[in-house]
Curated annotation (Swiss-Prot):
Main location: membrane
Topology of the protein relative to the lipid bilayer: Single-pass type I membrane protein
Protein name as catalogued: Delta-like protein 4
Signal peptide span: 1-26
Tissues with expression: Expressed in vascular endothelium.
Residue ranges crossing the lipid bilayer per the database entry: 530-550
Cytoplasmic side: 551-685
Region of interest: Interaction with Notch1: 185-187, 191-195
Notes on the domains: The Delta-Serrate-Lag2 (DSL) domain is required for binding to the Notch receptor.
Listed GO CC annotations: plasma membrane
Organism: Homo sapiens (Human)
Gene for this chain: DLL4
């Protein structure tokens, strides 16, 4: 137990010592490189010469910035050199006598960016160079400067001159190992263990080693394609499956234990393939089990009656999986690596300078001239890798790709893209402008059509619609027009075109005036022969039509008169007796003559009964009769009209029926009024 305690105490002590040493080493170094010291006369600052010569050494004091440098404490550090030479001499990079050039002034704090520097040259009469061992007048020269200084690898050259001496030197500030940043305050130590896998960049940031990622490069990058949820890895390019999953990329579920011919979508399932059944899909149902057509361990699935599908194992193809595939056919090896097919995959044999599963990582350095097309190589991470700075028009990790700045088709509206070294330009089609031909230019904007022509902007130019009297591409040509084409003159006037003004002039005939001869002058009115002619013609036409109508009527009246008629004589005596009363008789047929026969009793016929024949209601001839005799008491002679005889045996004549010949063109109608003492005989067509 005591031994264990002592061992633990020892380790703790060693750790403290290491930490103290690390802190004492500081975070940076101020370096001063002496180059040349000139003391041609070999004298001291007091002007007294050195005997036999000035054996010169230097004391350097570095301190914080002061506007006026004082000889106080050297807060940033101090250093002395051995004797470097006599009088005038040049200082080598590493002087003899155990001195170091450049001189190192380490500091263990954040570099402030400003400083004050004192450089003293002393004469050493003996070998003891301690300040207390030297007389005060042994000083040869003293210079003091102050300024700002950034951390960097570049040296700043300076030269200080006094009355008797001249000193040329250079200086810089660099960070100590494992310190980075603008003020050497960032600590970074590369490592490749459980706590991280990285190197340090020039700014102190971590740069993960290939295959690692994360804030401190502790997370491995799994095999490409490894399922994010179903797989994991403990080292790069590895893919370990979680429970229930299998396969190279852990994307295949593990079916239920004992599942023979089934699949799964989640772990521990057993979904039978077609043609198999049972709890574990081990019962053969059809063609696949009976005939086993699939080769090389392929899975057979029934897809119908006597049909099947073979699911081949990796590395096989064909209908029955009878053909073997090589995984090297896809050329997985990069950078010229050769592929070797293996039973469970493939292996890439990488050429010199490359490594990795697919030879994707390069081990080249700038010494191998890896940059093409004039690219410059720059080493990174202390030569662990490199970066190529490509010239214009080239890109890629090794400047192997030529940049085509027209690939993105930047020119619009059909413009042509042209490469012009580090830039590009667009050649626009007519009608477009702009850096990328994005602006449409209207050819009509400048009003190119003359004399009031109308401009039409076309895709590849413009077109002018010219007004009357102008032609040409821009309506610039004046042309004469036929002003008389529209016949503007009236009343048979003669039209002339005025070529100077492109207008018309009307030469009017006698009797008309006006710009178009549209106004008549005061002349005696002429006889209206046209109206008279039309009236006379119309009258003649009406007369002819009347004559034609009369002729047609006469032709219709010339039928035979001996036709059979139904006369009043066909009536019975009683009917005759009551046919004609002693009232007025109206005969509407002017062609017929009325005769009343009173029969045997003539007494009534001798009476004055005023049987009057009234022809007023007869508009025209209605029929033709052949009955002889006249009515004795007629007020109007019937002339040559054919008689219509009416016979009656009684003194009263009562007419109650129609009597007329049925086959004649006219009908004699006996019209009986409401009063019995009135009898009307009429004809009706």
């Amino acid at each position: 137990m005591a031994a264990a305690s002592r061992s633990a105490s020892g380790w703790a002590l060693l750790l403290l010592v290491a930490l103290w040493q690390q802190r004492a080493a500081g975070s940076g170094v101020f370096q001063l490189q002496l180059q040349e010291f000139i003391n041609e006369r070999g004298v001291l600052a007091s002007g007294r010469p050195c005997e036999p010569g000035c054996r010169t050494f230097f004391r350097v004091c570095l301190k914080h910035f002061q506007a006026v440098v004082s000889p106080g404490p050297c807060t940033f550090g101090t250093v002395s050199t051995p004797v470097l030479g006599t009088n005038s001499f040049a200082v080598r990079d590493d002087s003899s006598g155990g001195g170091r050039n450049p001189l190192q002034l380490p500091f263990n704090f954040t570099w402030p960016g400003t400083f004050s520097l004192i450089i003293e040259a002393w004469h050493a009469p003996g070998d003891d160079l301690r300040p207390e061992a030297l007389p005060p007048d042994a000083l040869i020269s003293k210079i003091a400067i102050q300024g700002s200084l950034a951390v960097g690898q570049n040296w700043l050259l300076d030269e200080q001159t006094s009355t008797l001496t001249r000193l040329r030197y250079s200086y810089r500030v660099i960070c100590s190992d494992n310190y980075y940043g603008d003020n050497c305050s960032r600590l970074c130590k590369k490592r490749n263990d459980h706590f991280g896998h990285y190197v340090c960049q020039p700014d102190g940031n971590l740069s993960c080693l290939p295959g690692w990622t994360g804030e401190y490069c502790q997370q491995p990058i799994c095999l490409s394609g490894c399922h994010e949820q179903n797989g994991y890895c403990s080292k790069p390019a590895e893919c370990l499956c979680r429970p229930g999953w299998q396969g190279r990329l852990c994307n295949e579920c593990i079916p239920h234990n004992g599942c023979r011919h089934g699949t799964c979508s989640t772990p521990w399932q057993c979904t039978c393939d077609e043609g198999w059944g049972g709890l574990f899909c081990d019962q053969d149902l059809n063609y696949c089990t009976h005939h086993s057509p699939c080769k090389n361990g392929a899975t057979c699935s029934n897809s119908g009656q006597r049909s099947y599908t073979c699911t081949c194992r990796p590395g096989y193809t064909g209908v029955d999986c009878e053909l073997e595939l090589s995984e090297c056919d896809s050329n997985p090896c990069r950078n010229g690596g050769s592929c070797k097919d293996q039973e469970d995959g493939y292996h890439c044999l990488c050429p010199p300078g490359y490594y990795g599963l697919h030879c994707e990582h390069s081990t080249l350095s700038c010494a191998d001239s890896p940059c093409f097309n004039g690219g410059s190589c720059r080493e990174r991470n202390q030569g662990a890798n490199y970066a190529c700075e490509c010239p214009p028009n080239f890109t890629g990790s090794n400047c192997e790709k030529k940049v085509d700045r027209c690939t993105s088709n930047p020119c619009a509206n059909g413009g042509q893209c042209l490469n012009r070294g580090p830039s590009r330009m667009c050649r626009c089609r007519p009608g477009f402008t702009g850096t990328y031909c994005e602006l449409h230019v209207s050819d009509c904007a400048r009003n190119p059509c003359a004399h009031g022509g109308t401009c039409h902007d076309l895709e590849n130019g413009l077109m002018c619609t010219c007004p009357a009297g102008f032609s040409g591409r821009r309506c610039e040509v004046r042309t004469s027009i036929d002003a008389c084409a529209s016949s503007p003159c009236f009343n048979r006037a003669t039209c002339y075109t005025d070529l100077s003004t492109d207008t018309f002039v009307c030469n009017c005939p006698y009797g008309f005036v006006g710009s178009r001869c549209e106004f008549p002058v005061g002349l005696p009115p002429s006889f209206p022969w046209v109206a008279v002619s039309l009236g006379v013609g119309l009258a003649v036409l009406l007369v002819l039509l009347g004559m034609v109508a009369v002729a047609v009527r006469q032709l219709r009246l010339r039928r035979p008169d001996d036709g059979s008629r139904e006369a009043m004589n066909n009536l019975s005596d009683f009917q005759k007796d009551n046919l004609i009363p002693a009232a007025q008789l109206k005969n509407t047929n002017q062609k017929k003559e009325l005769e009343v026969d009173c029969g045997l009793d003539k007494s009534n016929c001798g009476k004055q009964q005023n049987h009057t024949l009234d022809y007023n209601l007869a508009p025209g001839p209605l029929g033709r009769g052949t009955m002889p005799g006249k009515f004795p008491h007629s007020d109007k002679s019937l002339g040559e009209k054919a008689p219509l005889r009416l016979h009656s045996e009684k003194p009263e004549c009562r007419i109650s029926a129609i009597c007329s010949p049925r086959d004649s063109m006219y009908q004699s109608v006996c019209l009986i009024s409401e009063e019995r003492n009135e009898c009307v005989i009429a004809t009706e067509v």
